[in-house]
Structures are given as structure tokens and as C-alpha cells.
Curated annotation (Swiss-Prot):
Homodimer. It is an enzyme of class 2 (transferase). Its cofactor is pyridoxal 5'-phosphate. GO terms for molecular function: L,L-diaminopimelate aminotransferase activity; pyridoxal phosphate binding. This is LL-diaminopimelate aminotransferase. Involved in the synthesis of meso-diaminopimelate (m-DAP or DL-DAP), required for both lysine and peptidoglycan biosynthesis. Catalyzes the direct conversion of tetrahydrodipicolinate to LL-diaminopimelate. It comes from Parasynechococcus marenigrum (strain WH8102). Keywords: Aminotransferase, Pyridoxal phosphate, Transferase. It catalyses: (2S,6S)-2,6-diaminopimelate + 2-oxoglutarate = (S)-2,3,4,5-tetrahydrodipicolinate + L-glutamate + H2O + H(+). SUPFAM superfamilies: PLP-dependent transferases. InterPro entries: Aminotransferase_I/II_large, DapL/ALD1, PyrdxlP-dep_Trfase, PyrdxlP-dep_Trfase_major, PyrdxlP-dep_Trfase_small. The lineage of its organism: Bacteria, Bacillati, Cyanobacteriota, Cyanophyceae, Synechococcales.
């Protein structure tokens, strides 16, 4: 009989969001008339920007002509989109990033997982705790961890706790690690990093030969102009970092699928024989072999994000969701709950009421208020006692959810 990948058997009971889905499904089956409000998974709700829709319509019409038809595109992405990304997202902020260093993809979740294809199995890995579960689970699937302990932490990983006690800022590891996952603005806590904090990570990585995997999927939600949007705003980051970005949350592409990864030329790792190897070439080879590129139509939609109209519409979407976050912060603070995040990210991180753990608070809100959120413990042991609410929903639903919770 064929053998399975035994690493999958090390995974805990279920990926966080499917487990939430299972509980919600069971509740809905038992309470078919309940009007649930979902503030859990970070999926957007507002329509795609008009500029993007019009660009995709034009691209569809072009595909119906002999002159405008496009088959397989470049695996790295069309040059015009890569140029727009480099100009607007990086060069405009003083980052030395060229179009050739940008790889367009169908999602930053995919890229942050697939990047392991080009990295060795013996790397020592550091993640924050709490953490976006994909970083941990993909390393488990790839056989880069041991078994999970009683708290759910996997052997072989270095966990860096973040909580209110340390201002949600992970401490630099006391021992050398090879691979460091950082996410700012942070999912799930909503915390942000200053340039000084990122510089400390870059300095550590350069001193120890480490690689930072920097997830900037929520950078568009930063409100303070002094805060960095990219790791490449930090001097020396080209020598030690790869960055993941997405159009999902700022432009509403969760169902449309377009993202990109930045791999600087000159960024190197080490082969088993000690030889220095450029990661750009390995990632380019990986993408050329395993990926056929993002649809021409979708890339035209993403390009429109950088038009004047697209930029204005994206700003409007970001402002809308951040207004939702402000409502959640204000209403729940007024209800006596301790609130973090929600100022530079679309996530509000809540301290659960005394005597209630994360899943207990989840069940409490589901059963008593018919509101779905995300238990903090699902993001790691240090998330126990916290709870995440997402600002991605309609204003009417956010207002209704707050009224229900305050009435408890």
C-alpha cells in the first residue's frame, strides 16, 4: 500500500479556521434561525475597486481577439505589473528594489509556504507566539519540526512570545537561528514595528547569517507615516530578507488571487558543501518549474491598483475597514474589555474576560451573541487568554455585532 507523508500526522487536531468552521457549522445546524455575524477569518467583504474591474473587463475583451489573446505568461509575472509594483511600493519609499526582483503569484500564503522548497531542511527556525498558523504548519508538513508538546508547540522550533507584557515585541533570540518569520503589521495581534525594531532584526540576521521571511500583507493599513511598510526600508535588509506582499486585503483580491514576493539579487544562502548560492536563482527556478503564472486578466486588474483612480479606491477601502476597527475598539473598550491592535491593522486583539479561556470566549460569543471571532490560543500557546476580531465586514454588521456583545 502507498505510504503517506507522515509529517501531516504530526499536525494538531485541525488548522485553526477549519476548526472554527466545524464549530460554526454544528451551531448553525442546531440553530438554523440564528443570524450569525462573522468577524473571524480575515476575508474582505467590500466590492473590488472599479478601476480593477474595468481593467479586467478590458482584458477579457482583449482575450476574445486574435491580437489581444494571451496564453501562458511569464512565470515571474508580466513586466508592466512588476515595474508598477517596484515603482509605487518600493522605490517611492526609498527602497532599492527592481522589477526583476519581484515575483508575481496567486497568494502570499502560498509563497510563504513554497519558499521552503529552496531552503535546507537543517535550518533552525524562529516564529513568534502567537503566530499566523501557516508558518508553523507548513514547516511541520515539510518535516522540519519534531512532535507537538502539551502546549501545542513543536520540537525544533524556537518560539518568541509576544504579549502585553512585552508590548507585543518579540525579543531577539539569545541563540543563533537561521530562519526568522516576522509579520508586520502583525497577524493576529495588530502590533506594528518601528524602524528601530526592524533594524535590530536586520542587524541580528546579518551578524548570524540568518534569513528574515517578512510578511507585509497588511502594510497598507499603517496609519503613522513614520512606520516602515517594508523590511527593505532598513539598511542592509537586501542581504538578509525576503518579503511577501498581497493585493488581497488592500484591494479586495481574496477571491481574485494576486500577490508577489520580493527576492533581492545578491541575497545568498549556503549549500551543503559550504558554497554560497544566490536565492534569486533558486526561487526563479522553482517558480519556472512549479508555477504557470497568474492569469493575464488578473494581473491587469492588479496593475490598475496603481492608477490614480485605483489608488484612491484602495485608500477608501482601507479607510473603511480601519473605521470598522475603530468602532470595535471604542465599543469593546467601553464595555470594559482590554483592547490591543486595530490602529494600524484590521485586527483587534482582545484580552478575554477573567476566568474565560480563548475557546471559552469563542463559544460564549457564538452561543450568546451569535458572533464569530477567532480564539487567540489557535495562534499559539501565548495567544491563550486573547481573542481576535476582524474589521473585515459591512458597517451594519460591525455595529450589530458590537451591540450584541455589549448586551451580554
Amino acid at each position: 500500500m502507498v505510504q503517506v507523508n507522515g509529517n501531516y500526522l504530526k499536525l494538531k487536531a485541525g488548522y485553526l479556521f477549519p476548526e472554527i468552521g466545524r464549530r460554526v457549522k454544528a451551531f448553525s445546524a442546531a440553530n438554523p434561525d440564528a443570524a450569525l455575524i462573522r468577524l473571524g477569518i480575515g476575508d474582505v467583504t467590500e466590492p473590488l475597486p472599479l478601476a480593477c474591474r474595468e481593467a479586467m473587463k478590458t482584458a477579457i475583451d482583449a482575450m476574445g481577439t486574435a491580437e489581444g489573446f494571451h496564453g501562458y505568461g511569464p512565470e515571474q509575472g508580466y513586466g508592466w505589473l512588476r515595474e508598477a509594483i517596484a515603482k509605487h511600493d518600493f522605490q517611492a519609499r526609498g527602497c532599492d528594489i527592481s522589477a526583476e526582483e519581484i515575483f508575481v503569484s496567486d497568494g502570499s500564503k502560498c509563497d510563504s509556504s513554497n519558499i521552503l522548497d529552496i531552503l535546507g531542511e537543517g535550518n533552525r527556525i524562529a516564529v513568534t507566539d502567537p503566530v499566523y498558523p501557516v508558518y508553523v504548519d507548513t514547516n511541520v508538513m515539510a518535516g522540519r519540526t519534531g512532535e507537538a508538546g502539551e502546549e501545542g508547540r513543536y520540537g525544533g522550533l524556537t518560539y518568541l512570545p509576544i504579549s502585553a507584557d512585552n508590548g507585543f515585541a518579540a525579543q531577539i533570540p539569545s541563540e543563533p537561528v537561521d530562519l526568522i518569520y516576522l509579520c508586520f503589521p502583525n497577524n493576529p495581534t495588530g502590533a506594528v514595528a518601528t524602524k528601530g525594531q526592524l533594524k535590530a532584526w536586520v542587524d541580528y540576521a546579518r551578524s548570524n547569517g540568518s534569513l528574515i521571511l517578512f510578511d507585509a500583507a497588511y502594510e497598507a493599513f499603517i496609519q503613522d507615516p513614520s512606520l516602515p511598510h517594508s523590511i527593505f526600508e532598513i539598511e542592509g535588509a537586501r542581504e538578509c530578507a525576503i518579503e511577501f506582499r498581497s493585493f488581497s486585503k488592500n484591494a479586495g483580491f481574496t477571491g481574485t488571487r494576486c500577490a508577489f514576493t520580493v527576492v533581492p539579487k545578491g541575497l545568498k544562502g549556503t549549500a551543503s558543501n559550504g558554497e554560497a548560492v544566490e536565492l534569486w536563482g533558486l526561487w526563479n527556478r522553482r517558480q519556472s518549474t512549479k508555477f504557470n503564472g497568474v492569469s493575464y486578466i488578473i494581473q491587469r486588474g492588479a496593475e490598475a491598483v496603481y492608477s490614480d483612480a485605483g489608488q484612491a479606491e484602495v485608500k477608501g477601502l482601507v479607510n473603511f475597514y480601519m473605521e470598522n476597527a475603530a468602532i470595535i475598539r471604542r465599543e469593546l473598550s467601553g464595555a470594559g474589555l482590554t483592547i490591543y491592535g486595530g490602529e494600524h491593522a484590521p485586527y483587534v486583539w482582545i484580552k478575554t474576560p477573567e476566568g474565560m479561556d480563548s475557546w471559552g470566549f469563542f463559544d460564549h460569543l457564538l452561543n450568546k451573541a451569535n458572533v464569530v471571532g477567532t480564539p487567540g490560543s489557535g495562534f499559539g500557546a501565548s495567544g491563550e487568554g486573547y481573542f481576535r476580531l476582524s474589521a473585515f465586514n459591512s458597517r451594519a454588521n460591525v455595529d450589530a455585532a458590537m451591540a450584541r456583545i455589549k448586551a451580554l
